[in-house]
Amino acid sequence: MNTVPARNNGEKASARTVVLCADDYALHPLVDEAVEQLTLQGRLSATSCMTTSPHWRQAARRLPALRPRLSLGLHFNLTEGHGLQPAAGIGAVIARAYAGALGGAAMRDAWRRQLDAFEDALGMAPD
């Protein structure tokens, strides 16, 4: 994590921690490469993992080497189908959410599948 001085508005300055998180790990090999390089350069603190991606299991194999420098989270995906599942656009998902029409059981099932994929590949829960 990077520490930067706080803005000085006449008060004593204190250090603040800046956490930089890259979204969509496993979306595409180039995204993964950028996350890995930035982590090794000390410029990235965390990433969210897209476990619905067909590249997820392969990409996940490289993550243990980046620990503990890189915190890992789950990217709860409702909009990227990756050609494997039907997926609505973000606008449709937002509209359904506002209308209360997403369906609790379907959301729990999607969450559980994605969390299980994360834990199965990495042997740990998200940070």
Spans of model-derived segments:
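CE4/NodB-like, metal-dependent polysaccharide N-deacetylase domain
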Residues: 106-127
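Active-site gating loops and adjacent loop-to-helix segments of metal-dependent hydrolytic enzymes
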Residues: 81-103
